[in-house]
Design a protein with these regions (language model features):
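Sec-dependent signal peptide recognition
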Residues: 2-7
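C-terminal motif of bacterial Sec signal peptides marking the signal peptidase cleavage site
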Residues: 13-15
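Core segments of small alpha/beta cavity-forming domains
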Residues: 42-79, 86
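Signal peptide-directed secreted proteins
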Residues: 51-57, 93, 153-158
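Short solvent-exposed beta->alpha transition segments
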Residues: 68-113
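Exposed beta-sheet edge and beta->alpha loop/turn motif
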Residues: 110-158
């Protein structure tokens, strides 16, 4: 019986052996798929495309007239999803909560290294300053809008 306990104790001790610590010679280079870009480094054509189409979409809320995107401006999925019904429904919610749209202010540009897409994040300025909203416009490598979305930013505690 003592032999079994001793054998069991030996097995438990051997299985609990810790791994050898890293010697530090095996350093891996940090790789990040998403890189935050400086505004000046970004292609001005892509920057202008994102701003113009984002502003055109948000001004629809003020004027109730939506000019649909062309195939040169946006991908098929964006054209298909940007319907007058969807936009007007979203605009009604936003206008009730934020008031009329005033302008966009570029806050961040993120480059996806693998797909060569650029994500432009804009702070949306509205009449009412109670809630902050952000517009995200994704431009693909062909210079077309691949995605557009808006979201309300969380309030920062004082």
């Amino acid at each position: 019986m003592q032999k079994y306990i001793l054998l069991l104790l030996l097995i438990v001790m051997a299985s609990c052996k810790s791994k050898s610590p890293n010697s530090g010679s095996e350093t891996k280079e940090a790789y990040s798929r998403y890189v935050k870009m400086d505004f000046k480094e970004v292609n001005s054509a892509k920057k202008n495309r994102a701003y113009d189409l984002g502003k055109r979409l948000l001004e629809t809320c003020n004027t109730s007239k939506f000019k649909s995107f062309s195939k040169e401006e946006a991908t098929e999925s964006v054209i298909k999803n940007a319907t007058v019904e969807k936009i007007s429904k979203t605009c009604q919610k936003i206008i009730m909560r934020n008031g009329k749209f005033i302008d966009l202010q570029l806050s961040e540009v993120i480059h996806d290294v693998e797909t060569d897409d650029y994500l432009f994040k804009y702070k949306i300025q509205y009449e009412k300053k109670y809630f902050e909203r952000e517009l995200n416009v994704k431009i693909n490598k062909d210079g077309k809008v691949a995605a557009m979305s808006t979201k309300e930013l969380a309030k920062k505690p004082m």
